[in-house]
Amino acid sequence: VAINQAGVDVTTAVAAATGRVVIYAATSAGVPGPLLYLGTEDLDLSTVGFKFHTLAFTFQAGKLYYVGFIHGGTAVIRAIQGYSLPAFGLASSTSAAPLSVLSQTVTYPNAPVEFAFDASAHLAARAAPSVRMRVA
């Protein structure tokens, strides 16, 4: 499936806030691996509304991808609550909150060329950014 737009819906704008969409391929183990796409320009999150990158990216059938969003500010974007997402598991045998989001701390605007997945450091029970895409 080819897409020509990917972006986020800003619900609370913050002056000078910016962000970028990222797409990672999965490794043979099914965890995030190499970076396939990093938005080439900052998305301006200083006003509300849909902000998008124009791109040419094709998702290949039968492959797993991880789509995310990195940002350099505190603007609020539309998100999907963690309880509405597929769970990766629980943090412990007594935990009630499913781990449903993968996250990594990076220095904006850089995204690592390899995600370097570590379950203990990257799994979280929280909302995930809602990245919207348009089919080309």
Where on the chain are the PLM-derived regions?
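A short beta-strand element within beta-rich, extracytoplasmic domains
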Residues: V1-A13, V67
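Surface-exposed receptor/substrate recognition regions of extracellular proteins
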Residues: V1-A2, A17, S103-T105
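Intrinsic-disorder/low-complexity regions
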Residues: I3, E41-L43, P109, F117
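Intrinsically disordered, low-complexity regions of eukaryotic proteins
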Residues: T11, D44-S46, S120
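Aromatic- and Gly/Pro-enriched, solvent-exposed loop/edge beta-strand patches characteristic
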Residues: A15-L99
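Short, surface-exposed beta-strand/loop patches at domain edges
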Residues: I70-A136
